[in-house]
């Protein structure tokens, strides 16, 4: 890689940092540029940012291609080294060369690396042996079918100075996080002459961490016979079997940690579909769906002035989602929701607590934004306005329910007659059975109800429109599926998309190193709003929290001391938990401090630190899109 390419990579990563390519909790703490000039200057600034965005995207694509090529080169080197080591082993078996092989020992510092590396092998990722090995389950931190960290504990032993090929990706992630402390930053990091040496060093560092974290788990693996089939998710826990008083799920929904001095705010009517309105705009790092509650804390003057300017009693504002990718035909669109404030209270430090509820989906034209966009999770101090358009919600009722069967209609809602009545209806219509089933949503609702029974959720809405959004929040869909359902105007299609995910078994993965953290089957509702809820901490930062009964053994560590201050769940203390492999914050452990309170312990996983993926998914060793995204995220965060 020549100096010109290196400089271009450095420039691209700087641009990625400015644009916040991958938003994380730390990035939200950075100050955004603020422009106090008039509307004309603001529009010019936005146009300049849009142009820079297009140019930077092209540079980012070039960098992704460079990184892909780099991983391919490393993979090829691993194959060559594997072949050399195979030949070396053959020579060791030769009595004539046994003495020479015995004397050919690695340096002392490498000899001190964890003995766990003796169990690892470097195989081509697409080989049958690799696929067989990757499907097995071990107790290590990076197993459990975690993408990018396939289990290799049953592989053929290799010398300690070998770098397993399936560790290169995670080594690069950790290596990049230290780029800021190096002279020359990421450009120096990626130079060919020292890249492999530093990756090798980082692999050994990771293995030392992994060895310390999973000694107990590895001992269990040694004493058990490996299973040839992937391990299925454990049976869900039943919190009702615990002794004690069941926690009141209404308490978290009230957000009582804001205090008791909250006043009701008059409501507002739904806005007409297709209409355009100018309103106050904030940004948010998560995707909100209509019906979801958003608690936040900002300077009181922003909302108070908005009430005075609008002349209305109620307050409605827009929340945009930068993570929602705009359509290719119109890259200047930003999607979001309207939110209505329904309660507020003083915090005692010139900030006001607000509780709001998402109402309708909207689309924002970025060319119309007036003022600096600010994140609602960072206590914004300046106003930003834009014109928004209310998106429609189309719902087609089931065709058979639109047919008047005369005197037979009285049998329509009798459960014992339902199937027979349906057959009568089908014989009287020109539509085939498949066409009627395509627009039927009752069987989808019933399958979703059965799946959610294990989560102890009994607040399922009956309105199809509200139900479609509610299911997205409680069925732990992947980020791709969440975006797809949000952009869908048809409720019927939205429910069909949800139906395709009901049979999938999913895991929570660490967003930084891809370690497996928890099974989605262990989700349960600690709030009447469901398993996924937005909460606000004492600093004003909003966390999307997923509550689970348990996490995977040896997957987490702890940071700091437990505390009951500003606890989202009354009667519980919280303790920060971190990924045991990469030491990144991934959520909190909640432990009951009041006697006879059930559950005794549960965990809240932060949506900004975890991602949802299939248990069967695999990520290639080289050329991985996830690796490139993760690398860019770490680069932009470290270079800011």
From Swiss-Prot:
Residue ranges of the region described as Disordered: 1-25, 92-159
Species of provenance: Drosophila virilis (Fruit fly)
Matches recorded under CDD domains: CRBN_C_like
Cellular location(s): Nucleus
A single cellular component GO annotation: nucleus
Residues holding Zn(2+): 510, 513, 579, 582
GO molecular function: metal ion binding
This protein's UniProt keywords: Metal-binding, Nucleus, Ubl conjugation, Ubl conjugation pathway, Zinc
Annotated ranges, domain CULT: 505-614
Domain Lon N-terminal span(s) in chain numbering: 278-506
Pathway(s) this gene product operates in, as recorded in its UniProt entry: Protein modification; protein ubiquitination
Superkingdom, taxonomy of origin: Eukaryota
Subunit (UniProt): Likely a component of a DCX (DDB1-CUL4-X-box) protein ligase complex. May interact with pic/DDB1.
Biological process per Gene Ontology, one example term: positive regulation of Wnt signaling pathway
Keyword check for Transmembrane helix: no
Gene: ohgt
Lineage: Eukaryota, Metazoa, Ecdysozoa, Arthropoda, Hexapoda
Biased composition range(s): Acidic residues: 1-11
Low complexity composition bias: residue spans: 113-137
PTM entry text: Ubiquitinated.
UniProt main location, coarse: nucleus
The name this protein goes by in its record: Protein cereblon
Family: Belongs to the CRBN family.
Protein's job: Substrate recognition component of a DCX (DDB1-CUL4-X-box) E3 protein ligase complex that mediates the ubiquitination and subsequent proteasomal degradation of target proteins. Has an essential role in mediating growth by negatively regulating insulin signaling. It also has a role in maintaining presynaptic function in the neuromuscular junction synapses of third-instar larvae.
């Amino acid at each position: 890689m020549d100096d010109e390419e290196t400089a271009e990579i450095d420039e691209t990563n700087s641009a990625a940092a400015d644009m916040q390519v991958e938003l994380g909790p730390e990035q939200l703490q950075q100050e955004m540029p603020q422009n106090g000039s008039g509307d004309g200057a603001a529009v010019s600034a936005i146009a300049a940012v849009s142009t820079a965005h297009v140019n930077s995207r092209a540079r980012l694509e070039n960098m992704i291609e460079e990184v892909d090529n780099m991983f391919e080169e490393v993979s090829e080197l691993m194959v060559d080294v594997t072949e050399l080591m195979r030949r070396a082993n053959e020579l060791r078996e030769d009595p004539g060369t046994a003495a020479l092989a015995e004397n050919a020992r690695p340096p002392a510092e490498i000899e001190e690396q964890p003995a766990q590396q003796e169990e690892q092998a470097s195989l081509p990722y697409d080989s049958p042996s690799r696929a067989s090995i990757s499907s097995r389950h071990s107790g290590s931190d990076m197993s459990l079918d975690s993408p990018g960290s396939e289990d290799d504990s049953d592989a053929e032993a290799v010398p300690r100075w070998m770098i397993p090929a399936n560790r290169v990706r995670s080594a690069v992630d950790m290596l990049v996080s230290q780029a800021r402390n190096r002279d020359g930053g990421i450009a120096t990091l990626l130079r060919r002459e020292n890249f492999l040496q530093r990756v090798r060093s980082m692999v050994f560092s990771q293995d030392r961490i992994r060895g310390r974290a999973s000694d107990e788990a590895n001992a269990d693996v040694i004493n058990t016979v490996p299973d040839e089939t992937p391990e299925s998710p454990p049976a869900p826990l039943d919190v009702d079997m615990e002794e004690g008083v069941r926690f009141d799920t209404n308490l978290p929904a009230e957000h009582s940690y804001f205090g008791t001095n909250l006043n009701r705010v008059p409501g507002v009517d739904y806005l007409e579909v297709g209409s355009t309105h100018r309103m106050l705009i904030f940004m948010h790092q998560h995707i909100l769906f209509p019906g979801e509650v958003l608690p936040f804390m900002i300077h009181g003057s922003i909302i108070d002035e908005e009430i005075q300017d609008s002349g209305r009693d109620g307050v409605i504002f827009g929340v945009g989602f930068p993570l929602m990718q705009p359509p290719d035909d119109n890259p200047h669109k930003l999607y979001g929701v309207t939110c209505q404030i329904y309660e507020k209270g003083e915090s005692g430090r010139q900030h006001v607590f607000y509780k709001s509820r998402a109402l309708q989906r909207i689309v924002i034209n970025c060319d119309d934004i007036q003022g600096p966009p600010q994140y609602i999770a960072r206590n914004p101090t300046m106003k930003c306005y834009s014109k928004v358009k209310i998106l429609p919600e189309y719902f087609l009722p089931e065709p058979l329910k639109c047919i008047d069967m005369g005197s037979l209609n009285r049998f329509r809602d009798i459960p014992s007659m339902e199937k027979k009545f349906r057959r009568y209806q089908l014989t009287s219509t020109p539509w085939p059975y498949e066409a009627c089933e395509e627009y039927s949503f009752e069987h989808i609702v019933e399958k979703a109800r059965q799946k959610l029974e294990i989560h102890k959720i009994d607040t399922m809405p009956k309105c199809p429109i509200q139900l479609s959004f509610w299911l997205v929040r409680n069925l732990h869909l992947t980020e791709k599926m969440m975006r797809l359902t949000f952009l869908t105007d048809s409720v019927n299609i939205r429910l069909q998309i949800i139906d395709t995910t009901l049979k999938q078994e999913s895991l929570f993965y660490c967003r930084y190193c891809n370690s497996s953290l928890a099974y989605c089957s262990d989700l349960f509702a600690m709030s009447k709003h469901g398993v996924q809820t937005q909460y606000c901490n004492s600093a004003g930062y909003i966390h999307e929290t997923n509550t689970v009964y348990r996490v995977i053994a040896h997957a987490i560590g702890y940071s700091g001391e437990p505390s009951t201050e500003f606890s989202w769940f009354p009667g519980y203390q919280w303790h920060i938990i971190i990924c045991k492999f990469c030491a990144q914050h991934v959520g909190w452990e909640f432990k009951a401090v009041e006697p006879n309170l059930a559950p005794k312990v549960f965990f809240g996983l932060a949506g900004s630190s975890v991602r949802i993926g299939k248990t069967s998914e695999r990520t290639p060793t080289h050329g991985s899109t996830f690796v490139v995204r993760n690398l860019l995220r770490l680069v932009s965060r470290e270079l800011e």
